[in-house]
From Swiss-Prot:
GO cellular component, one term: cytosolic small ribosomal subunit
Alphabetically ordered keywords of this record: Ribonucleoprotein, Ribosomal protein
Pfam family, one: Ribosomal_S28e
Family designation: Belongs to the eukaryotic ribosomal protein eS28 family.
Transmembrane segments: none
GO biological processes: maturation of SSU-rRNA; ribosomal small subunit assembly; translation
Protein name, as recorded: Small ribosomal subunit protein eS28
Organism: Sulfurisphaera tokodaii (strain DSM 16993 / JCM 10545 / NBRC 100140 / 7)
HAMAP family: Ribosomal_eS28
Organism lineage string: Archaea, Thermoproteota, Thermoprotei, Sulfolobales, Sulfolobaceae
Gene designation per UniProt: rps28e
Length: 83
């Protein structure tokens, strides 16, 4: 298998399952009961490799965790405090 075929096979696997991203910062908790955590992630592979996104994550998360993102287009809104 040539290098070109390997890279095409790898890119199709990434697009099929999602894009890996590493948690680099935990921002805050959100949601009615605080069940969602807003985090900053760095995309590790794909066309947006190196891009830093803000995403909402449900469940336990720590710095350095690897998340699989279905898409890298959308970003979470910034959290605002109610007065």
């Amino acid at each position: 298998m040539s290098e070109k075929e390997k890279s095409q096979a790898q890119s199709s696997v990434i697009e099929e399952f999602g894009f890996p991203a590493e948690v680099i910062q935990i921002l805050d908790r959100t949601g009615v009961t605080g069940e969602v955590t807003q985090v900053r992630v760095r995309v590790l592979e794909g066309r947006d490799k190196g891009r830093i996104l803000t995403r909402n994550v449900k469940g336990p998360v720590r710095l350095g965790d690897i998340l699989i993102l279905r898409e890298t287009e959308r970003e979470a809104r910034k959290l605002t405090t109610k007065r």
